[in-house]
Curated annotation (Swiss-Prot):
The protein's assembly and partners: The nucleosome is a histone octamer containing two molecules each of H2A, H2B, H3 and H4 assembled in one H3-H4 heterotetramer and two H2A-H2B heterodimers. The octamer wraps approximately 147 bp of DNA. H2A or its variant H2A.Z forms a heterodimer with H2B. H2A.Z associates with the vps72/swc2 subunit of the SWR1 chromatin remodeling complex. Also interacts with rbp1/DNA-directed RNA polymerase II largest subunit.
Subcellular location: Nucleus; Chromosome
Post-translational modification: Acetylated once deposited into chromatin.
GO biological process, one term: CENP-A eviction from euchromatin
Pfam family membership, one: Histone
Organism of origin: Aspergillus terreus (strain NIH 2624 / FGSC A1156)
Protein name: Histone H2A.Z
């Protein structure tokens, strides 16, 4: 027998033409936009003792990163829209993150060129109001 061990001649037996199939990445199969392969490589390279990283773990971490990014960008886009500009700047990111209580506790980093939140202490406001009342009474 020319093929040996039951193999047929001329390619795989019973398979469709490979031109009819389209290849899908792992990210596309999971419905993600972020690259699962890059995240998995990052996880493998940055773990202690060269631990193994499962495929599902990489998909899960990628999905979490994608969700958090979408959340921050949505809030920053709303902040930019409120200020009537079309470009998101670090200031808009700062306003978005510090305005949301959960994101503020999660992201404690200092954002470069983010500025500070507009806030006036109540004690200072009370002093100004008392001075105005004193001037209006006299």
């Amino acid at each position: 027998m020319p093929g040996g061990k039951g193999k047929s001649i001329g390619g795989k037996a019973g398979s469709k033409d490979s031109a009819g199939k389209t290849q899908k990445s792992h990210s596309a199969k999971a419905g993600l936009q972020f690259p699962r392969g890059s995240v998995k490589r990052f996880l493998k390279n940055n773990t202690q003792n060269k631990m193994r990283v499962g495929a599902k773990a990489a998909v899960y971490v990628t999905a979490v990163l994608e969700y958090l990014t979408a959340e921050v960008l949505e809030l920053a886009g709303n902040a930019a829209k409120d200020l009537k500009v079309k470009r998101i700047t670090p200031r808009h990111l700062q306003l978005a993150i510090r305005g949301d209580e959960e994101l503020d506790t999660l992201i404690r980093a200092t954002i470069a060129f983010g500025g500070v939140l507009p806030r006036i202490n109540r004690a200072l406001l009370l002093k100004v109001e008392q001075k105005k009342k004193g001037k209006s009474d006299s």
